[in-house]
Amino acid sequence: MSVAVRGRSARGWGLAAMLLLAVAACRESAQDPAKPAAEPVAAVQAMALRLAEDDLVGYAKLSVPPSQYQRLQQAWTEGHSQWPLTELPLGDQLLPMLAALRKPNASAELQRSFDRQLAGQAGAVRQAAQSMGNFGVQYLRHQKGYTPGQQAHYIALVETLASWAQGAPISDRARARSTIAALVGAANKVGCDDEAGLQAAGMEGSLAPLAPFIHTLKAVLGSYGLGVDDALRSVRGELLSVEGDNALVRLRYDLAGREMSLQLPLSRREGPWYLTRTLADTDALLRKAEAARAAASPSPAEAPAEGGEAATPPPKP
């Protein structure tokens, strides 16, 4: 099905789903959906609910403190950031995906690519899904940098998605035709498909029109038997520990008929709880934005004087 997006093989949808749920397993459900939750598990559920409801702006607002959110908006406008797109699944592939789907005759080209590579190849698709699943598991088992809990979660995620892909009707030509039509139609309704367009629109101005495309992408996965929104809405958890402004929660969610489990650290900042990883990532991003801003600013010696010319030191007596 990745053919519908980029004219490639079935691995694309499995990867899209894996990335979507890897991030999604970390998100949201509060009494007032516009306000950060005061309790760690509820904070994660609240973010997940915003994603399930295609509210990318609301998700972003719940992910970081208000003061940091404003700075991230500024960094976006200045071209130093595309957060939160960079932490969402397929964030780095979103613009190329939109560009491919918006090309003239995209539907016909993608359908021809599908017919050439996947149509009627159910056995080959199943074998490819199994092989990719096995490769992914072996890769994760030898990858350093994960905690045992993270490694176990990612392995279970890859195994579940590989199993789903083996049984999904990925090689069905009629289904692919409707999938391609849906994605091409949704992509053509997005206002921009390049870096300059995103920067000009601003963070909220970019996220809002992207939401319908994300909704269509999730609906396509659902039509192939992978309920992303169901998984997001199923997020539940328990508080394992709290030490000062740091907490650890165990989350569970249901994906393709299997219960998934993972542990996540959260940090309290300015009152509410946020994912520790998100705070660290955005802190680093803002530091880089500040450094880029400083590098682009003229030094005091280069700053123009009041008369409009470069300032020069007075002559020595």
Please give the residue ranges for each predicted region.
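Bacterial N-terminal signal peptides
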Residues: 14-24
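Acidic, glycine-rich loop-and-strand cores that form catalytic or ligand-binding grooves
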Residues: 192-222
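A short hydrophobic beta-strand element
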Residues: 243-251
